[in-house]
């Protein structure tokens, strides 16, 4: 499993921060990175970990980022009570179906045998 999303201006804005916000200290940036990395691991674990290129596909990447950002933001703001949002769960369901389709196209089956 490989994480490749970074705490960029887009993710900072998702969390309500401006890119050069004075309120962004090293601790906040580290929490952002941890939340985003954990969200990626969660999403990939929920969908499938075998095909890392799947998540970088131009048709998949926007939904993948949206799911990771939604979960990462939730965990950033509510670390002790965070659960996945309904939106993130719906996106994961869509991505799981797309992942299965790509595995069938690639291997002829979704099974790992």
Residue ranges, per PLM feature:
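Divalent metal-cofactor coordination and adjacent catalytic microenvironments
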Residues: 1-113
């Amino acid at each position: 499993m490989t994480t490749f999303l970074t705490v960029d201006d887009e993710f900072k804005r998702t969390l309500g921060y401006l890119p050069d916000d004075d309120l962004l200290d090293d601790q906040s940036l580290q929490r952002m990175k941890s939340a985003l990395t954990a969200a990626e691991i969660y999403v990939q674990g929920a969908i499938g970990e075998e095909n890392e290129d799947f998540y970088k596909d131009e048709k998949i990447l926007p939904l993948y980022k949206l799911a990771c950002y939604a979960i990462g933001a939730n965990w950033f703001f509510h670390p002790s009570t965070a659960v996945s949002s309904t939106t993130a769960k719906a996106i994961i369901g869509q991505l799981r179906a797309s992942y299965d389709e790509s595995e069938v196209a690639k291997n002829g089956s979704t099974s790992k045998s």
